[in-house]
Amino acid sequence: MKASSGDQGSPPCFLRFPRPVRVVSGAEAELKCVVLGEPPPTVLWEKGGQQLVASERLSFPEDGAEHGLLLSGALPTDAGVYVCRARNAAGEAYAAAAVTVLEPPAPEPEPQSSECPPPPPGTGEGAPVFLTGPQSQWVLRGAEVVLTCQVGGLPEPKLYWEKDGMALDEVWDSSHYTLEPDRGASDGGASLTLRILAARLPDSGVYVCHARNAHGHAQAGALLQVHQPHENPPQDPDEPPVRVIEPLKCAPKTFWVNEGKHAKFRCYVMGKPEPEIEWHLEGRPLLPDRRRLMYRDRDGGFVLKVLYCQAKDRGLYVCAARNSAGQTLSAVQLHVKEPRLRFTRPLQDVEGREHGIVVLECKVPNSRIPTAWFREDQRLLPCRKYEQIEEGTVRRLVIHRLKADDDGVYLCEMRGRVRTVANVTVKGPILKRLPRKLDVLEGENAVLLVETQEAGVQGCWSRDGEELPATCQSSCGHMHALVLPGVTREDAGEVTFSLGNSRTTTLLRVKCVKHSPPGPPVLVEMFKGQKNTVLLTWKPPEPPPETSFIYRLERQEVGSEDWIQCFSIEKAGAVEVPGDCVPTEGDYRFRICTVSEHGRSPHVVFNGSAHLVPTARLVSGLEDVQVYDGEDAVFSLDLSTIIQGSWFLNGELLKNDEAEGQVEPGALRYRIEQKGLQHRLILQTVKHQDNGALVGFICPGVQDSAALSIQESPVHILSPQDKVLLTFTTSERVVLTCELSRVDFPATWYKDGQKVEESESLVVKMDGRKHRLILPEAQVRDSGEFECRTEGISAFFSVTVQDPPVHIVDPQEHVFVHAITSESVMLTCEVDREDAAVHWYKDGQEVEESAVIVLEKEGPRHRLVLPAAQPSDGGEFQCVVGDERAYFTVTITDVSSWIVYPNGKVYVAAVRLERVVLTCELCRPWAEVRWTKDGEEVLESPALLLEKEDTIRRLVLPSVQLEDSGEYLCEIHDESASFTITVTEPPVRIIYPQDEVTLHAVSLECVVLTCELSRVDAPVRWYKDGLEVEETEALVLQSDGPRRRLVLPAAQPEDGGEFVCDAGDDSAFFTVTVTAPPERIVHPVARSLDLQFGAPGHVELRCEVAPAGSQVRWYKDGLEVEVSDALQLGAEGPARTLTLPHAQPEDAGEYVCETRDEAVTFNVSLAELPVQFLAPEAVPNPLCVVPGEPVMLSCELSRASAHVSWSHNGNPVKQGEGLELRAEGPRRILCIQAADLAHTGVYTCQSGTAPGAPSLSFNVQVAEPPPVKLVSELTPLTVHEGDDATFQCEVSPPDAEVTWLRNGAIVTPGPQLEMVHSGSSRTLIIRGCQLKDAGTVTARAGATDTSARLHVRETELLFLRRLQDVRAEEGQDVYLEVETGRVGAPGAVRWLRGGEPLPLDSRLTTAQDGHVHRLSIHGVLLTDQGTYGCESHHDRTLARLSVRPRQLRELRPLEDVTVHEGGSATFQLELSQEGVTGEWAQGGVRLHPGPKCHIHSEGRTHCLVLSGLGLADSGCISFTADTLRCAARLTVREVPVTIVQGPQDLEVTEGDTATFECELSQTLADVIWEKDGQALSLSPRLRLQSLGTRRLLLLRRCSSSDAGTYCCAVGTARSGPARLTVREREVSVLGELRSLSAREGDSATFECTVSESETTGRWELGGRALRPGGRVRIRQEGKKHILVLSELRTEDTGEVCFQAGPAQSLARLEVEALPLQMCRRPPREKTVLVDRRAVLEVTVSRPGGHVCWMREGVELCPGSKYEMRSHGTTHSLVIHDVRPEDQGTYSCQAGQDSADTQLLVEGDD
């Protein structure tokens, strides 16, 4: 495929989508994406549908195809979804990402107490925080390294260091590590410095400082890289390599690799000091680069990995390890196997600048060979960045817009995985980029390194767009490191290093470590000890879990299936389960399991069961009850368990087998209840004589009693609780109700402070507790303040009586009046009361009567008259009556302007076949207009309609066409209105297919994709996988009417993909899948063949498949074969082979070659061949041995079952006499156990007895051994105590025995003594020499010996790790440790205090662990403070122990409490010490125990309980003890309002009042009423009332529209829905309609009287509904309904109907027509031009009248010359194509009226 670009380009495509971003408020947020397209797309950013523009905080950086959105100082309002929209000429694409802005953590509140100064920064109570972290370093070998960290936190954290996940003392060679604590840092916090003296290459690695205290753990890491100093100048590559290592002593191993594959070498080296590793190739040191990776694996092995091997990589690779004790080598010879098919010209390494381009070029042997490009293991697809070009045999890869991450290894691959490799180097600010990806196990350390061109520059590390903290970043010169210690799954993501516009990215992947759950406890046992308890014991799991764990104990009642958790235990051992732990009495079983963070172990069930009984205790006892006479008395108590009890009243047992009972007939009634742990006794309606009754409760273990006290209840008002405001209209019934707490208690009513007197208009009633004042028909004078007074308390009512509101009867709608200058305008408003006050307003100002404005009144009708209206009189008029208004809009048009609308030019855009209407409004309804199009008068037709309606003139195009575009004029006299119509084609739509189509085809099938459009001539474009297709022989594009087709005549699998048919405004999608043809076996033709071969021999099975690329699988006897040296599989073109190079009889069987669709079977049989000697054992000829030495002669036959015979010098050899004959498979062996001189000669092994049978001979020579002697002498040695001593000598012959003696005693090998034999060299090694090992060492061989003297010098016992000052708190355990340079003998060191030996006891103990000596002080006391020392014979170290008194701390702090009014609150805290006395305070005032305040303490726990709380109790609760003070907040909230009783369903009659009522739990609360989910608002018909806790909703004059669902809501409480049903009133007609006859132009009035005044009616004329307005006026006067029809017309004749509900009345209206007259006549004289059109027009008095047109007295007939038109009252005569002969007199006859016009014609013919 050649690179090319189409003319149309490619639509935008997102290569990388923006990622969601989470930032803290005030930080910087950045979104990035990569978009490609041709031409380069325009990128816009949007939020909430609005395009974003650059500002001070918002910018849009671009870098080639990378586009970004940078938001500085992010605010919470900036959060949301941001859309990146890319658009070019070829299409559009978009992507979205969310930005989340988090609020910054709130600052810690400052302590209220000023007694203690605030702690220094970083040392506040809490988890450790790193103030200063270690910094990564790059040093030369031998340099000193100092890693320092400083940590804050309280309590002071414990610090320790790790290297590569191991503690420093676990590192093999850590003698040069020194830890220096510094607890006196000036800026606070703990500090621990790691100092490495004379750094070595093995010291390279990741160092992590851990900080841990009771509140948590923190860690920070740094990278240390130790480099070899550059001692020699760089070598000229043309010079031969200089040997830097010793020659190898043995032949290296050989390793073969195919070209383009990876080679991996691994060596494992041990030594002390830890050895330094170097890799060499052909003697030259290797350095890591892009294709050579050097690292150390998790098992400690050193690995060299050569990527994508090439021919130049062949050679000898050596791993050299050296330390101060010596060096060792390991080598391997690498051979690179080159493929047969090779690149004609391979790739060459290239370099390029960042943001530039590079070109990689190679040549293939044949232009038809397909190739693929890779960047390392990632396949590269063609795009704008990676342009792939094929020109003949040349293959090019052009990389555009280079970035740091483009640096790497690139490959071009042919078939057969033949590759050519090249390096691409990107020059820029970043020299060494990050790896593509990094895989790290969970918990390991992750290290990322970047090298920059300039030193000292500041880069930025981020993960998934979020900047990483500075504690894990380090920079030194050109190197930048990111160290992530102990990675977790949350650390995974895309890590980026940015430097200006350059960046490099890696994908950090964290692999989870699978942890096993802990094991179960063992040795579980149950002991039934004391009564009502059970003892459970167990042992910890084996092996114990690695992490912390607990034990979970569960119980199960026998007979139940449910297990219930009892409690959790941290330590193993025993636990006693009392009966109080179970809810009810029963037999219980128990089980236990181990739980840790890694899961739960299986349960272990304790054998047997235990019977447990819960013991009842009194949790909350009985209390004396005081109630009023007639109320219920409730006694209750709470027990600790569910148990039955008995109630007593005055010593008499109350029956509890019934829900209710009675002490005795006619006496006190009671009710007993039990809910769970609570028992209640309710004495109902107690009387005064029950005063002093004693109530008791008894159950097993509990007995309690209380007394009943009854008081005479004072009278009080139950309702209303507050003042009631009531509003009524005159004649309404008013009822004021006051409910008292006592029955028949007297009360007095007052009005305005005066006692009321009963009369017919005011009635006072008393009914039980309720007292009522009734006004049967309220009047305005009854308004006032009413009071119901009794026993000094009162209920108040404010009553307001008003006249009923006035309503406007007509008009009900907005009235629009149009008039011309000097016309009379009348505005009429009718109200329902004649005495109502009416006010008129114009444009908001009240009008006053004058010469130009006349105000009239006629009964309920009020009029405003403009006798001679002027344009300035127009405006907005209002008729205001009470709260109602009627609106009139008056428009006065000057005669000079006939066209009211439109005022300017109108532009109409339409789509073909749409309906277009042009509207022109005139000032008068009888005015005539003329319509023209592009200067020509239009003619009415089905395609063009002219309409006239009152003052409106319309031109209608029912189905507009393209040719209808143009300018239309509506002309009248000298005025015109202009309309410009533009008609366009409708957008193209795809009719078929509507959904995505999926097609499946087989190779070479014809695939047709069809798309049907809404337009025949619409163009389309076809795309495949986002690229526009081009028509070729393999892809044909067709067009047939509205159908468009894409045809693949012979589809191939690569033709599959997503096809898109793009019609501009619409697209259709097709998914095509083309599968390969069936895979067949074309040779052999037979499907089963029988083949025979010799064994052993070469067997080859061969098949040919079609197509040639088909995959096959081979089977033997039903099992798939595996490739090995004995079985090889081959494939070349269509041929597939299976080869057995050395077939044996056992290889016979059934072989099957199987493709996806076919198979062929080979039945292979193997016959044995004659016996042959395959190979003798590798022995010299002749074989020379010494007497007594064993001899073994061996050979191998071609068949294991063959028989052989042995002979010695021609004589048969027999078993025995020191000779042994053996057969081991195909091998035949002759063994001589101890050779002597008689065994010299020729030994022959012959197969078979036939003459000429194959044979094999061996020549054995037995000779005397050479004498044994020592060749070299031992050397005297002097070593230090603890070092190794090595004695070495050489012996001849090499196999001679050597005996070692020490001080004359034979040496026996052991842990300290080691003897080494290597050729002729003999070595004795004495490990860890001690002073007692000094003496003489002797080596003896044969008759010779040699001796040397060993001297052992005593080593000084010095302290490597010295004592450190320790600060401790009284009662803690303190440990002092030192580390010596060697392991000293017991008692080699001694401990001191104050310079004196330290006496040891149970609190002071010492211990030694190798090099470490430890002093332990358990439960340190204040007297233990002082100076402690540790000394040996050669060294001494001192440290100071400081002990501070035990401080009081809170282990569990106080917590804020929120309760409701009347509730109780409990505050509890736990201190670090017992027996502490503290004080509780509220709002700074000390609290003392009382009825509402309970204070108690138990051990370290202190508790405060406050009950009966009110709103005023909110505030600060504090606890003070010694120097400790802690506080919490108490918040008391109001009890939320609830709805006690909601509204009920109602059914009312239309016109009546509906009242909904609900009752609340509180008096002062606002209620919202809703109807059908919508809140209701006040209106004249809707009133709201509040009566104490009752809330009323009153709906007056209900109609059917009021029906629906009503509910009330208060706060969060909502009542259930209540349904209002409005019944229709039964209406009957009292006064029927009367038929009328009237003349045209007169008025007609119809009246109908019905039985109900609140009924609405409906009027009809001729079956058509009538509505007020124009000539129709409708009004209602009580029960009378009136219809007035003015300006009658003949067409008004018909039946008049009035209907009110089911009632109906009919009448007949007859309208007599007036004689037809002309209202407007034609001009007496009219002049027209020749060839033009003449129009004569008249207007008659009524529409439908007939007129007659005549010329010179002769009636004209319609035709092509004359056209008669009629529209309403207008009649026209149109004379077409006027000629001179058309001159004359034209007459129009309308009834008895006529008019003449003289037509004059001007112009030449």
UniProtKB/Swiss-Prot annotation:
Biased composition (Pro residues): 104-122
Modified residues (Phosphoserine): S10
SUPFAM superfamilies in the record: Fibronectin type III, Immunoglobulin
Localization (cell): Cytoplasm; Cytoplasm, Perinuclear region; Golgi apparatus
Limits of the Ig-like domain: 12-100, 128-225, 240-330, 339-425, 720-800, 804-891, 902-982, 986-1075, 1078-1165, 1176-1261, 1266-1351, 1355-1442, 1536-1628, 1702-1798
Ranges for region Interaction with TTN: 17-19, 85-94
Record key words, sorted: Cytoplasm, Disulfide bond, Golgi apparatus, Immunoglobulin domain, Phosphoprotein, Repeat
Annotated region described as Disordered, given as residue ranges: 104-131
SS bond list: C33-C84, C149-C209, C267-C319, C362-C412, C738-C788, C829-C879, C920-C970, C1011-C1061, C1103-C1153, C1195-C1245, C1558-C1608
InterPro entries: FN3_dom, FN3_sf, Ig-like_dom, Ig-like_dom_sf, Ig-like_fold, Ig_I-set, Ig_sub, Ig_sub2
Pfam annotation, one family: Ig_3
Tissue expression summary: Expressed in granule neurons, with levels decreasing with neuronal maturation.
GO terms under cellular component: 3M complex; centrosome; cytoplasm; Golgi apparatus; perinuclear region of cytoplasm
GO biological process, one term: microtubule cytoskeleton organization
Fibronectin type-III domain sequence ranges: 517-615
Function: Core component of the 3M complex, a complex required to regulate microtubule dynamics and genome integrity. It is unclear how the 3M complex regulates microtubules, it could act by controlling the level of a microtubule stabilizer. Acts as a regulator of the Cul7-RING(FBXW8) ubiquitin-protein ligase, playing a critical role in the ubiquitin ligase pathway that regulates Golgi morphogenesis and dendrite patterning in brain. Required to localize CUL7 to the Golgi apparatus in neurons.
Assembly, per entry: Component of the 3M complex, composed of core components CUL7, CCDC8 and OBSL1. Interacts with CCDC8. Interacts with CUL7; the interaction is direct. Interacts with FBXW8. Interacts (via N-terminal Ig-like domain) with TTN/titin (via C-terminal Ig-like domain); the interaction is direct.
Name of the molecule in the record: Obscurin-like protein 1
Organism: Rattus norvegicus (Rat)
Gene name of this polypeptide: Obsl1
